[in-house]
């Protein structure tokens, strides 16, 4: 019984092997018959004057990189090309029902479709793949390729920018009289387009011209549109007699701003608002100018970082560059104002006299507008009632805060009748004169101290004034500059959302 089952398995294996061999033999015979008199250098057209139609279909696999400095987009694509070659048709009945044959593309004629806006030395497809032959004569060739195409980068709204990149394909040799390149799309529309010379061209447009069914989402870019256009263009410099057809695939890319917002925009905004703290720092600390210079150095580092990201262009200034320039101007002004404030703070009565307009503006008007009040005024109000003596005797008590009133009190005091009748001895007179002299010195010193305090208060008022001005300027400048980007108000959803894998769509990264 066991031997019977082994024999049955061996018999089934032999039958399957014979069928497989017969199938391979039919395919081999078909291949030999097709290649006997086939010339792969000849254009497979039924008439020498009739153009051969090539249908193109681009399937985007991945956007590998968009290099802003070199202005190059690198992407992985599958370029599907379909045409009819009557010399490669057959009757499946004569070849054991074989209706599809796979052959190396080097063995048959293939169109010389190249990337016109190529950015490296590989203009055509170099990967060796097989073409699919159908018994009707239809040939399909869909090789994978990694293309580097030139893409003009617009840095006006960086890092909240959109870029328009394209891939332009066409035949390098055959004009429209010999090769007609068509869009392999079900829905097409036709429109007129005026070129730079004012010539009206008929353009075929496919709104969904790029297949995204196998697209792997980019971590930096969202796809907003994928239009394909077919044009016929003359090249007067080389071939003015006839036009050449090209198919251009446009990719409108919108940058995902999370990375640059966290690593570039937020630090810039933070550095900008650090400028305000310069005016809150006391002048006696001696670190006001140091803080200004430190902020200026930090902004310079960000400028150097920005030049490594964006292309060196003189056409426009990026949005973040405008904001950095605005912040640098603010920091420079803060350095100037800080130097003026420090100069006022350390002025003395022996070098500078305070003008009357400075007293009116900085000691009376501005403090009221800025809701500032000097603590010394409270002490003066408290001791105003203690200036006059109550008992008519000599008032020798020292002022709680200043001693400038001592001399006046001595001169203006009402002397006791008994003391007035006494004979003043020379030691008493000398002592009295010394007391008056000391009182004058103390009064002068007190006056100088008051002038010093007035200059310091002027510097404090100036700091408070520019603290308010710079706070408003930084806030308004940040809002006006950064919120001008159009993409911040673009509510369109990326069209590649529906093609993203389930694991990326179900667990989006939130900020």
From Swiss-Prot:
GO molecular function: acetylcholine-gated monoatomic cation-selective channel activity; excitatory extracellular ligand-gated monoatomic ion channel activity; extracellular ligand-gated monoatomic ion channel activity; transmembrane signaling receptor activity
Deletion consequences: RNAi-mediated knockdown causes a resistance to nicotine-mediated paralysis.
Ranges in a coiled coil: none
Topological region Cytoplasmic: 345-464
Keywords of the record: Cell membrane, Disulfide bond, Glycoprotein, Ion channel, Ion transport, Ligand-gated ion channel, Membrane, Postsynaptic cell membrane, Receptor, Signal, Synapse, Transmembrane, Transmembrane helix, Transport
Pfam families: Neur_chan_LBD (PF02931), Neur_chan_memb (PF02932)
Sugar-bearing residue positions: 124, 202
Cellular compartment(s): Postsynaptic cell membrane; Cell membrane
InterPro entries: Neur_chan_lig-bd, Neur_chan_lig-bd_sf, Neur_channel, Neuro-gated_channel_TM_sf, Neuro_actylchol_rec, Neurotrans-gated_channel_TM, Neurotransmitter_ion_chnl_CS, Nicotinic_acetylcholine_rcpt
Stretches of the chain found on the membrane's Extracellular side: 17-261
Membrane topology: Multi-pass membrane protein
Superkingdom per UniProt: Eukaryota
Cellular-component GO terms for this entry: acetylcholine-gated channel complex; neuron projection; plasma membrane; postsynaptic membrane; synapse
Chief site of localization: membrane
TM region positions: 262-282, 291-311, 324-344, 465-485
Gene3D superfamilies: Neurotransmitter-gated ion-channel ligand-binding domain (2.70.170.10), Neurotransmitter-gated ion-channel transmembrane domain (1.20.58.390)
Cystine pairings recorded for this chain: 151-165, 238-239
GO-annotated biological processes: calcium ion import across plasma membrane; chemical synaptic transmission; inorganic cation transmembrane transport; locomotion; monoatomic ion transmembrane transport; neuromuscular synaptic transmission; positive regulation of locomotion involved in locomotory behavior; regulation of egg-laying behavior
Subunit structure: Component of nicotinic acetylcholine receptor. In muscles, composed of 2 non-alpha subunits lev-1 and unc-29, and 3 alpha subunits unc-38, unc-63 and lev-8. In cholinergic motoneurons, composed of 2 non-alpha subunits acr-2 and acr-3, and 3 alpha subunits unc-38, unc-63 and acr-12.
Function: Alpha subunit of nicotinic acetylcholine receptor (nAChR). Probably acts in cholinergic motoneurons to regulate presynaptic neurotransmitter release, thereby ensuring normal level of excitation of cholinergic motoneurons during locomotion. Involved in nAChR sensitivity to nicotine.
Family listed: Belongs to the ligand-gated ion channel (TC 1.A.9) family. Acetylcholine receptor (TC 1.A.9.1) subfamily.
Protein known as: Acetylcholine receptor subunit alpha-type unc-38
UniProt source species: Caenorhabditis elegans
């Amino acid at each position: 019984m066991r031997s019977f089952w082994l024999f049955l398995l061996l018999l089934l294996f032999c039958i399957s092997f014979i069928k497989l061999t017969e199938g391979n033999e039919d395919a081999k015979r078909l291949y030999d018959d097709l290649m006997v008199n086939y010339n792969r250098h000849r254009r497979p057209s039924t008439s020498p004057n009739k153009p051969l139609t090539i249908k193109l279909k681009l399937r985007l696999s991945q956007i590998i990189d968009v290099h802003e400095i070199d202005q190059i987009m690198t992407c992985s694509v599958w370029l599907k090309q379909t045409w009819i070659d009557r010399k490669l048709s057959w009757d499946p009945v004569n070849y054991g029902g074989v209706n599809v044959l796979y052959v190396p593309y080097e063995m048959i004629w293939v169109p010389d479709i190249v990337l016109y806006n190529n950015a490296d030395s590989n203009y055509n497809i170099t990967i060796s793949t097989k073409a699919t032959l159908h018994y009707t004569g239809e040939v399909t060739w869909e090789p994978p390729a990694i293309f580097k195409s030139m893409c003009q980068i617009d840095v006006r709204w960086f890092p909240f920018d959109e870029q328009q990149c394209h891939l332009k394909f066409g035949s390098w040799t055959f004009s429209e009289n010999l090769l007609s390149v068509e869009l392999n799309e079900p829905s097409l529309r036709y429109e007129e387009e005026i070129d730079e010379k004012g010539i009206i061209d008929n353009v075929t447009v496919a709104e969904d011209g790029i297949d995204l069914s196998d697209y792997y989402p980019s971590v930096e870019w969202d796809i907003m549109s994928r239009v394909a256009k077919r044009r016929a263009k003359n090249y007067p410099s080389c071939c003015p007699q006839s036009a050449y057809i090209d198919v251009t695939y446009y990719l409108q890319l919108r940058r995902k701003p999370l990375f640059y917002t966290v690593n570039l925009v937020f630090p810039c905004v933070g550095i900008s608002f650090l400028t305000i703290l310069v005016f809150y720092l006391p002048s006696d600390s001696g670190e006001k100018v140091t803080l200004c210079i430190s902020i200026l150095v930090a902004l310079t580092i960000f400028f150097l970082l920005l030049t490594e990201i964006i292309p060196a262009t003189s056409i426009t200034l990026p949005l973040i560059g405008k904001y950095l320039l605005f912040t640098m101007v603010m920091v420079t002004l803060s350095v100037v104002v800080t130097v003026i404030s420090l100069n006022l703070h350390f002025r003395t009565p022996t070098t500078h006299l305070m003008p009357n307009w400075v007293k009116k503006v900085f000691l009376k008007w501005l403090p009221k507008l800025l809701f500032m009040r000097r603590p010394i005024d409270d002490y003066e109000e408290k001791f105003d009632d203690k200036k006059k003596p109550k008992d008519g005797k000599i008032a020798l008590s020292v002022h709680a805060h200043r001693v400038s009133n001592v001399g006046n009190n001595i001169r203006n005091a009402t002397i006791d009748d008994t003391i007035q009748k006494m004979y003043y001895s020379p030691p008493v007179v000398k002592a009295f004169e010394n007391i008056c002299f000391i009182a004058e010195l103390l009064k002068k010193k007190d006056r100088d101290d008051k002038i010093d305090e007035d200059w310091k208060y002027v510097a404090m008022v100036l700091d408070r004034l520019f603290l308010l001005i710079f706070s408003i300027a930084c806030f308004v400048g940040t809002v006006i500059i950064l919120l001008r980007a159009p993409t911040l108000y673009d509510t369109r959803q990326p069209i590649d959302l529906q093609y993203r894998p389930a694991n990326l769509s179900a667990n989006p990264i939130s900020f």
